[in-house]
Amino acid sequence: MLKNDLFLRALKRQPCSRTPIWVMRQAGRYLPEYRAIREKTDFLTLCKTPELAMEVTIQPVELMGVDAAIIFSDILVVNEAMGMDVEIIETKGIKLTPPIRSQADINRLIIPEVQDKLGYVLDAIRLTKKVLDNRVPLIGFSGAAWTLFTYAVEGGGSKNYAFAKKMMYREPKMAHMLLSKISAVISEYVCAQVEAGADAIQIFDSWASALSEDDYREFALPYIKENVQAVKAKYPDVPVIVFSKDCNTILSEIADTGCDAVGLGWGIDIKKARTILGDRVCLQGNMDPTVLYGTPEKIKAEAAKVLRQFGQHTAQSGHVFNLGHGILPDVDPANLKLLVEFVKEESAKYH
Amino acid sequence: MLKNDLFLRALKRQPCSRTPIWVMRQAGRYLPEYRAIREKTDFLTLCKTPELAMEVTIQPVELMGVDAAIIFSDILVVNEAMGMDVEIIETKGIKLTPPIRSQADINRLIIPEVQDKLGYVLDAIRLTKKVLDNRVPLIGFSGAAWTLFTYAVEGGGSKNYAFAKKMMYREPKMAHMLLSKISAVISEYVCAQVEAGADAIQIFDSWASALSEDDYREFALPYIKENVQAVKAKYPDVPVIVFSKDCNTILSEIADTGCDAVGLGWGIDIKKARTILGDRVCLQGNMDPTVLYGTPEKIKAEAAKVLRQFGQHTAQSGHVFNLGHGILPDVDPANLKLLVEFVKEESAKYH
C-alpha cells in the first residue's frame, strides 16, 4: 500500500534496496517554509492546529525527499494533557507550572482521556496520513517517562536535574509514582497514535544520559519497556524505535525492551553498536548534526563513513540513516537535501 | 615527606590501606567559608591573588578531610594568557572576546611566557605547598586543548559548539593550528605547575563528549597525549590524570595517552571501565554528584556501590574516589563530609 516502505522494511530488518533516511526535527526552523508558517502562529498553536501540523509535517517529505514523515508535535503535550501549564518559547526555553514536587502535586495530575486531551495530535495524524497518500510512512512519537518526569519536576529545562534527582534519591517511591503515572499516559498515547494511523513509534529519552547505569535501569528503562510492550501487545507489526541518547554502555538492555530499533547519538561508532547488538535490532543514526555545517565534500565523506561503519547488510540487518540528534535551526536546507540524496545513492552498495 | 600520600600511591597503583578521595570543585560555592571570601572579591581576582587562592584551596582539606588539594583556579586562565579578554560571572556565564574564528584571530593570539602571564597560579601553588606543609598532595590542572578551543571559538559556553564544529569541518587545518597553539601553552603551563610544586596534574576535557569517536581521535586525543608526554618527559614520577568526561566508548585510547589515571563520569559502571582497562591505569570516579542531594543512607549506599563495583584491589590496581563531575553549589557541606568519612572507612575492606 505504501509507495515507499523502505523505512518500515529497515525497522523490521527486511531486505532493502538502499538505506532509508529521515532526520530528527526535519519539520523545523531550518526550513524557510516552516518559518513562514511560524511567523503567523506560536509553537503550541501550531502543534494544536491539525491543518498546520500536517503542512509542516509534509514539508520535509516534499522539499527534502526523506523516506519517512514524523508528526509535528512536542513531547511536552503529554505533560500539558496531565494538567500542567506548559509554555514553550522555541528559542528561549520551556516553563511548566506548577513544578511537581510533592505527593499532593502528583495526585493533582490527571490521567487524561487521550482522545479528548490529545485529540488534536490524533486529528493531525489522520489528516497527514490522508494528504501523504501513502508516499512514505508516518512516525508517531512520545517523550519517555524519565525525560517528561524531569520537565515536570524541574518545571522546565535543567542543567543538573537537581529537583528530579532529589526526588529520586530522597523519595524514590514518590518518583516511581510520578513516573508510573506519566508512563501510563504515554502507553495510551502511542497506541492511540497507531490507531489514528501512525506507521511506527519513536520514544525519545532526550535526557537519558543524565543517569548512571543503575539509575537508568531503575528509573527509566522499565517505563520504556512498558511503553514498547503496550504497543507490541496491541499492534505487533508496528515498529518501535527507542532513542535513549548517549546511553552507549547499556545498548543491549535497551534492545531488551523489545523495541525494533535502537537510536544512537554520535558518541559511539555505529560499527561498535552493531558489534554489541548484532543484528537483533535495527540501528538508527548517527551522524553528528553539526556535520551539516560542513562543506558538501565533508558532508558526503561523513555520511559515507557512517554507511561504511555500519557495513554490509545481511538478511537480518537494518539501518535507518539519521542524525545523532535534531537538525540545528541554522543549517542550510541545501545541505540536508545533499545529505538525503547522497545517502540514497551511496547506501545501495551495502545492500 | 608527605604525611598522607595515599592519593599519589593510588595514582601510581601502589598498595594503599584504603581508597583516597577528593572531589572536583571541592574548593567552591557549596562551602560557606568559600562564599565568605567570594563576597569580598570576584572570581578572577580570587584566582589571581595567591593568598586568597591558597586559602580556598586549603579549606576542603581542613574542613572536609579530603586526601588531596587542587589549586584553586580556572581552566580559562590559559585563554586569557593567550590574549583573550575573559569574563566569568560564576552563576551566569562566560564571555571571551573577541571570539577566535579566522586565521588572523589565531595569529593575534600569543604563546605567552607562562612564568610571566600565569605567574600568579605558580605563586599560588608555591604558597599553598608551603602552608599545606605536606599534609596532602597538591593537584595542578589545565583544561584540555579541545575544551579551551571551544571557549575560544564560541566566545563562551555553548550548547551545540556550532562555531567550533564549523571550523573543524570547514577549515580543519586552521582548527589544528589553533589547537596546536593552545596545546603548546598547556604543556608549558602544566610543567611549570609541577616545577612550582604540584604533585600531580589533571587535564580536564569537560566538553569531550560533544565529539564523535573519530573527531575525538583527530581533534582532541593527540593534544592530550602531547600534554601528558610533556609532563612525563620532564617529570616521569608525576602522575597525570585525564578526565575526558563521558568518553566511555574510547577509554582504552585515553589510557594510551600514557596517563596514569583515567577520570570517569557517572555514565559508566566503574566495574565495566575496570574490565575494559584492566589495571593498567588508575581509575578516578565516579559517583553522580547529585547523590549528595540524597539522604545520609542513600549517600552511603551509593558510595558503597562505587567501591563494590570497583572491587577488590590487586598489587597493580588503583582507585581514587571522586564524583563524576564537580560538586554542585547547593549541596550541604555536611553531606560531603559524610561521604569523605564513609569512603575512608568503607574502602579499607577492598585493600
From Swiss-Prot, chains A, B:
Site (Transition state stabilizer): 74
Keywords tagged on the record: Cytoplasm, Decarboxylase, Lyase, Porphyrin biosynthesis
EC numbers, comma separated: 4.1.1.37
Keyword Cell inner membrane: no
First-level EC class: lyase
A GO CC term attached to the entry: cytosol
Entry's localization field: Cytoplasm
An example molecular function term from Gene Ontology annotations: uroporphyrinogen decarboxylase activity
One family name in Pfam for this protein: URO-D
One of the protein's GO biological processes: protoporphyrinogen IX biosynthetic process
Highest taxon in the source lineage: Bacteria
Task of the protein: Catalyzes the decarboxylation of four acetate groups of uroporphyrinogen-III to yield coproporphyrinogen-III.
NCBIfam families assigned: hemE
Subunit field text: Homodimer.
Protein name listed in UniProt: Uroporphyrinogen decarboxylase
Biological source species: Chlorobium luteolum (strain DSM 273 / BCRC 81028 / 2530) (Pelodictyon luteolum)
